[in-house]
From Swiss-Prot:
Site (Interaction with DNA): K268, N275, R279, G326
Keywords assigned by UniProt, alphabetized: Activator, Developmental protein, Differentiation, DNA-binding, Flowering, Nucleus, Transcription, Transcription regulation
Gene name linked to the record: FLO
A Pfam family annotated for this UniProt entry: SAM_LFY
Family: Belongs to the FLO/LFY family.
Top-rank taxon: Eukaryota
UniProt-recorded name of the protein: Floricaula protein
Organ and tissue specificity: Bract, sepal, petal, and carpel primordia, but not in stamen primordia.
InterPro entries the record matches: FLO/LFY_C, FLO_LFY, Floricaula/leafy_C_sf, LFY_SAM
GO molecular function: DNA binding
Presence of the UniProt keyword Nucleus in the record: yes
GO cellular component, one term: nucleus
């Protein structure tokens, strides 16, 4: 018997797979139904509303209904709170959609948060674009307020205001006691001075008084400016007086920007240059604008605004005599008191009536000088009626 007869030989060329009748009879299973898209899907259909509302508990279909009405993120950001209320009322009336109470507040909160984020990005972008040129341009004015020792007391009081008598000499004499008190408690005051920028008493009119009183309790710093004639460009490391007055114009521009942002956010709008404006200027890259410097020379700027001819004449006279900025600053008080005398001694009304001065607080020292001169004038008038001699200026 041939054993090969019982062997099965597989021919790969002719063999075909046997059809599976069982699988043919059974229909293929239907594909699984598509899952409902999550909240983070379909970003193009809602125009970015889902990203705006996602963190504020607003339902997806609420955002979809808002998108069906034609609203986008940019549209909502440019709408006021009253317009947002009208939009939500229209949503309820047109689609018969019941908005939850939390959704009404969530929509407004999301819009406000997005506005703040855009404003912060804009300030940061502006700081990156303008930071290099700004710091290079104004580094010289900033170095004047560094922690440097005083040259002499005459730098602070400016040679007694150029020989002016009466109250002006008393003010200069009262300032001679300041250096001893500064050296006594310098360490404690330096910490307080560093916290001054973060103080939030923006709307208190006593800021002007606090600034003048702090002259006694702060370490005296070197003046960052030199006396220059109108139109003269300063030479050396210090800037001229035209540049100083230009800083006040910049503060006015920053105040307008702060007011615009506050109105858009529905927040309290400042009417004067406060700490909020100085912080905004710092964020915008204008580190050379700070509260101590601007409050220190605000009466000089007031004279420049109220009587530019007298201010220019005073600058030329002090430039010819070689006087420093401290002497020029002290001499600026007397013309302002004379202006106040011609207008009933009401220096606050004079400031508030001027468009460029109404945003600044009246320095306490200027107000005190006006009060003292007013009292002296009243005493002199009384003495002339009774036949007495001339009255002396009253100290204060």
């Amino acid at each position: 018997m041939d054993p090969d007869a019982f062997l099965f030989k597989w021919d790969h060329r002719t063999a075909l797979p046997q059809p599976n009748r069982l699988l043919d009879a059974v229909a293929p299973p239907p594909p699984p139904p598509p899952q409902a898209p999550s909240y983070s899907m379909r970003p193009r259909e809602l125009g970015g509303l889902e990203e705006l509302f996602q963190a504020y508990g607003i339902r997806y279909y609420t955002a979809a209904k808002i998108a069906e009405l034609g609203f986008t993120v940019n549209t909502l950001l440019d709408m006021r709170d009253e317009e947002l209320d009208e939009m939500m009322n229209s949503l309820c009336q047109i689609f018969r959609w019941d908005l939850l109470v939390g959704e009404r507040y969530g929509i407004k909160a999301a819009v406000r948060a997005e506005r703040r984020r855009i404003d912060e990005e804009e300030v940061r972008r502006r700081h990156l674009l303008l930071g290099d040129t700004t710091h290079a341009l104004d580094a010289l004015s900033q170095e004047g307020l560094s922690e440097e020792p005083v040259q002499q007391e005459k730098e602070a009081m400016g040679s007694g205001g150029g020989g002016v008598g009466g109250v002006w000499e008393m003010m200069g004499a009262g300032g001679r006691k300041a250096p001893q008190r500064r050296r006594k408690n310098y360490k404690g005051r330096s910490r307080m001075a560093s916290m001054e920028e973060d103080d939030d008493d923006d709307d208190d009119e006593t800021e002007g008084a606090e600034d003048d009183e702090n002259i006694v309790s702060e370490r005296q710093r070197e003046h960052p400016f030199i006396v220059t004639e109108p139109g003269e460009v300063a030479r050396g490391k210090k800037n001229g007086l035209d540049y100083l007055f230009h800083l006040y114009e910049q503060c006015r521009d920053f105040l307008i920007q702060v007011q615009t942002i506050a109105k858009e956010r529905g927040e309290k709008c400042p009417t004067k240059v406060t700490n909020q404006v100085f912080r905004y200027a710092k964020k915008a890259g204008a580190n050379y604008i700070n509260k101590p410097k601007m409050r220190h020379y605000v009466h000089c700027y007031a004279l420049h605004c109220l009587d530019e001819a007298a201010s220019n004449a005073l600058r030329r006279a002090f430039k010819e005599r070689g006087e420093n900025v401290g002497a020029w600053r002290q001499a600026c008080y007397k013309p302002l008191v004379a202006i106040a005398a011609r207008q009933g001694w009401d220096i606050d009304t004079i400031f508030n009536a001027h468009p460029r001065l109404s945003i600044w607080y009246v320095p306490t020292k200027l107000r005190q000088l006006c009060h003292a001169e007013r009292s002296s004038a009243a005493v002199a008038a009384t003495s002339s009626i009774t036949g007495g001699g001339p009255a002396d200026h009253l100290p204060f």
